Regions:
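NAD(P)+-binding Rossmann beta1-loop-alpha1 motif at the extreme N-terminus of oxidoreductases
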Residues: 1-57
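Rossmann-like NAD(P)-binding element
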Residues: 49-71
Length: 71
C-alpha cells in the first residue's frame, strides 16, 4: 500500500513520523515537494519516504492520499 501526503507542514511531518515509527504496514510514502526543507528531512530520516515531482504524481501512484493543507 502506498500512502501519499499533499502538504508537508508540521502536521504532515508528525503523522508521517508516527506512521514510519509504528507497526503500520506500507510500501512507501510519497510526499509533496511543497516545503522542500521538511520534505528533504523526512526523506533522509525514513528510507520509505519519496518526494514527488508534483501533487498529481501523488494522486496517480498512491492508494490513500491525505490532504494536510491549511484550509
Amino acid at each position: 500500500m502506498n500512502l501519499g501526503f499533499i502538504g508537508t507542514g508540521k502536521i504532515a511531518s508528525s503523522v508521517i513520523t508516527g506512521i514510519c515509527t509504528s507497526k503500520i504496514s506500507f510500501n512507501k510514502i510519497i510526499i509533496s515537494p511543497r516545503n522542500k526543507s521538511i520534505a528533504k528531512n523526512l526523506k533522509q530520516k525514513f528510507k520509505k519516504v519519496i518526494i514527488a515531482k508534483n501533487n498529481q504524481q501523488i494522486v496517480d501512484k498512491c492508494d490513500w492520499v491525505f490532504l494536510s493543507v491549511t484550509p
